[in-house]
């Protein structure tokens, strides 16, 4: 298996994202999130006993999983796929297709890894990382890499939410967030110990329930251990203003 040059991949990622406005807190958030997901994938793969080559590949898949977010924010000023397009599909376009003529930067998968031997696996790990469920027809190896990226993404989203404002994440001010209530489908997902589907989130507060539900569907034991060790899942629901509010009272 061809070795992956992490320095080359980091440099390619930085070169691409430097063209976007890192003073925008939402761009900065996604850059930081990307690095954290890559490291989470590395940590989980190591703890699960993967080979050194597969650890590197898991790290790279984590680094590339959100490549579509930067164009999504530039074109539509939102992270909501329903109000723009699938950021996963956009990431595939950026890495494996043609970049738009007005994009501030262009890149290609070959900027990150010389060989094309892993292209289909990398493509799948990006394409399916935010899907509610993985396709049934995936082969076992591809599913393993998709699972580790999805786990790494969930783990760091917990940190991201805890460290960010609701305006940065949802483009909703705090008053509107606190005025919202949990919707019935979201609470049903919580009671069923499963993730919340996008079309089940009807209120800003539902995003918080969805975050907590991530813990139910982490695949790897090492992912669950890492999430518990980091403790980020507890921080959003420990805020004083949430504890005093109906939203916090339910949790």
Regions found by a protein language model. Give the residues of each.
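Short helix-capping/linker segments at secondary-structure and domain boundaries
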Residues: 216-227
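Alpha-helical phosphate/pyrophosphate-handling elements in metalloenzyme active cores
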Residues: 27-60
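Conserved small/polar residues in nucleotide/adenosyl-binding loops
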Residues: 240-247
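Short alpha-helical hairpin
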Residues: 2-19, 63-68
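Divalent metal-dependent catalytic cores for phosphoryl transfer on phosphate-bearing substrates
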Residues: 50-218
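Active-site flanking loop/helix segments enriched in acidic
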Residues: 12-36, 70-81
């Amino acid at each position: 298996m061809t070795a992956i040059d992490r320095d080359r991949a980091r440099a390619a990622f930085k070169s691409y994202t430097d063209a976007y406005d890192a003073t925008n807190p939402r761009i900065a958030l996604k850059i930081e999130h990307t690095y954290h997901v890559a490291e989470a994938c590395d940590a989980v793969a190591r703890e699960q006993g993967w080979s050194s080559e597969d650890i590197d590949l898991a790290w790279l898949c984590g680094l590339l999983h959100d490549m579509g977010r930067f164009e999504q924010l530039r074109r539509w000023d939102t992270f909501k796929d329903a109000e723009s397009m699938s950021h996963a599909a956009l990431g595939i376009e950026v890495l494996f297709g043609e970049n738009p003529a007005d994009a501030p930067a262009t890149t290609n998968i070959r900027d990150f890894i010389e060989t094309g031997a892993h292209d289909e696996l990398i493509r799948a790990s990006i394409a399916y990382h935010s899907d509610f469920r993985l396709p049934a027809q995936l082969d076992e190896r591809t599913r393993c890499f998709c699972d580790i990226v999805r786990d790494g993404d969930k783990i760091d989203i917990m940190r991201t939410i805890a460290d960010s404002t609701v305006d940065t994440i949802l483009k909703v001010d705090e008053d509107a967030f606190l005025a919202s209530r949990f919707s019935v489908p979201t609470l049903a997902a919580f009671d069923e110990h499963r993730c919340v589907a996008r079309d089940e989130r009807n209120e800003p507060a539902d995003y918080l329930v969805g975050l907590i539900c991530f813990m139910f569907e982490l695949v790897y034991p090492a992912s669950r251990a890492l999430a518990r060790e980091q403790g980020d899942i507890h921080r959003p629901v420990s805020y004083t203003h949430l504890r005093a509010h109906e939203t916090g009272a339910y949790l």
